[in-house]
């Protein structure tokens, strides 16, 4: 067998990503559209018995759209598809050729503008046509991209790829556990698998699982069939973590079904995924769902989906925040009075991992006005203030109008005299001190373990550390022995009843407490 080699699709060029925040700093509404050229289209061919290797088209297309973000996403960036994540261990000696197509990712957090999305879809599809013939397709998706006039864009991509390929070429897709998955996707994708962990730690595992199944499908060992069953429950991800009940037990049941199958159906269950969904994407598909891939039996896939959906529905009242929570004032008071030497506060309403603007100064203002000593806010997206800091220089004092340059619905910028502590040129960011509070300005950093060092900051030097996320990600839990999630306002508000939903499914729990759901009524 020939080893894996990378084959570049013809006539494809890509430009580097221009960051959204840089464009905003220049006064633009979003980053400019970056275009990838594709080659001429060809008609699909059946796999050739004379070719030395099976050709697998690989690409990524993902976004966690926050429709409550005040600014539309009007552009995509087109990074060169990195085939390294597709160099799977299960493919090492399989004699496959990886054919990288165009990958596309929106450059902002808000609802994707329809024209830009349509162009991105056409670029990806054009690169697929230019790469034909192929024997299979492997896509890395998210599942929560939402575009004006298009809807669930990732699902639309799979549908349109199926139209190009015809019915026989297998398509494998991996998803984030927080995807909002349309039921119709199962008609077009063959192998559909999502994360089983939140916080996510199993990306490599699900890629290997999908890759193994795709290889089996290419070789004719399996005939994958998928089924998707929506469950009318809409929750913030912080109420559905696989480290806590009830999702931990529900995911264990999904794993058991993969091992043992479903009663009364001899067909093997190849993959079973429970999706939490993304609550900040207001769409008809928003919410929990079950995705099953079975070997040759839609009935078995449906039965497994019904079983898991019923278990989820029965547990709907058990979902709760998996960490300590508090309103802003109370949370800060608890942190200051805590016996623990350090406390991590997360600004959940402006949680950048939920595609918020990341520019709200609400927590910073509160800490400064309360004269809190030894606090670190990491960080606030604000390229204008960063520019002023660079103009002033390290050690200088400068008047700043911090934050609220995108998100203006929750209060004005925070006006303050700040001392410039550190400038980091390659990140175009600045650390400043206001009273006893140090804050990092620039991109909306999540505050992961590797983020602090370039600024000369050590989280252990502070009693209170604030980051713009919800639950703790791997590594963040080492910052402090105690974590309090602040229930702050913003586009990522954990209090979903404070958000203005227009398109979500109705009835849905917990919005409609008396919502009814019968999984047995799922289409055959």
Where are these regions (language model features)?
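N-terminal export leaders
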Residues: 13-27
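N-terminal amphipathic/basic leader segments beginning at the initiator methionine
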Residues: 47-93
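Extended hydrophobic packing segments that form well-structured cores
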Residues: 313, 426-524
């Amino acid at each position: 067998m020939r080893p894996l080699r990378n084959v570049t699709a013809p006539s494809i060029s890509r430009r580097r990503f221009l960051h959204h925040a840089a464009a905003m700093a220049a006064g633009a509404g979003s980053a400019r559209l970056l275009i990838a050229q594709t080659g001429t289209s060809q008609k699909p061919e059946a796999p050739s018995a004379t070719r030395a290797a099976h050709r697998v088209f690989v690409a990524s297309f993902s976004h966690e759209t926050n429709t409550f973000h005040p600014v539309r996403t009007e552009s995509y960036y087109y990074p060169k598809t990195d085939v390294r994540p597709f160099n799977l261990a299960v493919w090492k000696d399989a004699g496959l050729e990886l054919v990288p197509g165009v990958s596309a990712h929106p450059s902002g957090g808000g609802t994707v503008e329809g024209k830009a999305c349509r162009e991105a879809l056409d670029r990806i599809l054009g690169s697929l046509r230019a790469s034909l013939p192929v024997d299979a397709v492997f896509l890395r998706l998210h599942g929560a991209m939402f575009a004006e006039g298009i809807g669930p864009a990732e699902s639309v991509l799979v549908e349109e790829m199926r139209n190009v390929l015809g019915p026989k070429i297998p398509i494998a897709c991996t998803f984030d556990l927080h995807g909002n998955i349309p039921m119709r996707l199962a008609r077009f994708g063959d192998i559909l698998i999502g994360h089983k962990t939140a916080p996510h730690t199993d990306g490599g595992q699900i890629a290997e699982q999908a890759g193994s199944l795709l290889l089996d499908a290419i070789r004719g060992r399996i005939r994958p069939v998928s089924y998707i069953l929506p469950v009318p429950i809409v929750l913030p991800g912080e109420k559905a973590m696989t480290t806590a009940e009830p999702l931990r037990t529900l995911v264990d049941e999904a794993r058991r079904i993969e091992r043992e199958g479903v009663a009364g159906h001899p067909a093997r269950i190849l993959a079973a995924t429970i999706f939490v969904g993304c609550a900040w994407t207001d769409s008809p598909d928003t919410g929990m769902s079950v995705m099953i891939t079975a070997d040759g039996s839609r009935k078995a896939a449906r039965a497994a989906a019904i079983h898991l959906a019923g278990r989820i529905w029965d547990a709907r009242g058990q979902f709760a925040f998996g960490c300590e929570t508090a309103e802003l004032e109370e949370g800060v008071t608890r942190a200051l009075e805590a016996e623990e030497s350090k406390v991590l506060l997360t600004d959940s309403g402006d949680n950048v991992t939920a595609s918020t603007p990341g520019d709200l100064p609400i927590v910073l203002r509160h800490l400064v006005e309360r004269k809190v000593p030894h606090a670190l806010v990491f960080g606030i997206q604000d390229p204008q203030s960063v520019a002023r800091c660079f103009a002033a220089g390290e050690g200088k004092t400068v008047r700043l109008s911090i934050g609220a340059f995108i998100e203006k619905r929750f209060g004005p910028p925070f006006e303050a005299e700040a001392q410039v502590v550190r400038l980091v040129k390659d990140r175009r960011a600045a650390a400043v001190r206001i009273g006893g509070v140090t804050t990092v300005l620039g991109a909306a950093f999540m505050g992961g373990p590797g983020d602090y060092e370039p600024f000369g900051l050590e989280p252990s030097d502070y009693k209170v550390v604030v980051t713009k996320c919800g639950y703790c990600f791997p590594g963040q839990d080492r910052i402090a022995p105690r974590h309090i999630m602040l229930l702050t306002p913003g586009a990522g508000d954990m209090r979903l009843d404070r958000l203005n939903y227009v398109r979500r499914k109705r009835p849905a729990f917990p919005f409609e407490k008396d919502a009814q759901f019968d999984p047995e009524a799922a289409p055959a």
